């Protein structure tokens, strides 16, 4: 499993903080916006397309508020994403909704909160079972 991360210019500093945190915790991290100054549309699409290459990959897209990246990610067929700004939502969206991408707002969450959000998202496992009905409903919408 790889954690795919990307940001627009507004999210670059927070992206670097999260990337270091993930690597320090022995996660494989792929930064798809390492040398680019992309718009949130392009940076999020880069994350989504890389996540789609492996069913085990997870993604993190960062912009100023998280909303733009969320809107982009959810436009892609079969992609379930959540805009999160707290640890519980990050954990639950993975466990109950099988979200593969979270979006964060660099102007919304601070460094320590972002690390905790990412930790809970990455460590959570999809529960399946009764939650699969909802996931199937989401996927039928595309």
Swiss-Prot record:
GO terms for molecular function: galactose-6-phosphate isomerase activity; ribose-5-phosphate isomerase activity. It is an enzyme of class 5 (isomerase). Pathway: Carbohydrate metabolism; D-galactose 6-phosphate degradation; D-tagatose 6-phosphate from D-galactose 6-phosphate: step 1/1. GO terms for biological process: D-allose catabolic process; galactose catabolic process; lactose catabolic process via tagatose-6-phosphate; pentose-phosphate shunt, non-oxidative branch. It catalyses: aldehydo-D-galactose 6-phosphate = keto-D-tagatose 6-phosphate. SUPFAM superfamilies: Ribose/Galactose isomerase RpiB/AlsB. Keywords: Isomerase, Lactose metabolism. It comes from the Bacteria. Its EC number is 5.3.1.26. HAMAP family: LacA (MF_01555). Belongs to the LacAB/RpiB family. Heteromultimeric protein consisting of LacA and LacB. This is Galactose-6-phosphate isomerase subunit LacA.
């Amino acid at each position: 499993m790889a954690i795919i991360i990307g940001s627009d210019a507004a999210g670059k500093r927070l992206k670097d903080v999260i990337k270091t945190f993930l690597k320090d915790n022995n996660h494989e991290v792929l930064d798809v916006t390492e040398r680019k100054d992309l718009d949130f549309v392009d940076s999020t699409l880069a994350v989504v397309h890389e996540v789609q290459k492996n069913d085990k990959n997870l993604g993190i897209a960062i912009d100023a508020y998280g909303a733009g990246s969320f809107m982009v990610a959810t436009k892609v067929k079969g992609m379930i994403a959540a805009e999160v700004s707290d640890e519980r939502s990050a954990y639950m969206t993975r466990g109950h909704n099988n979200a593969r991408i979270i979006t964060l707002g660099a102007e919304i969450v601070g460094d320590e909160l972002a690390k905790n959000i990412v930790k809970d998202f990455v460590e959570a496992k999809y529960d399946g079972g009764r939650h699969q009905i909802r996931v199937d409903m989401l996927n039928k919408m595309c």
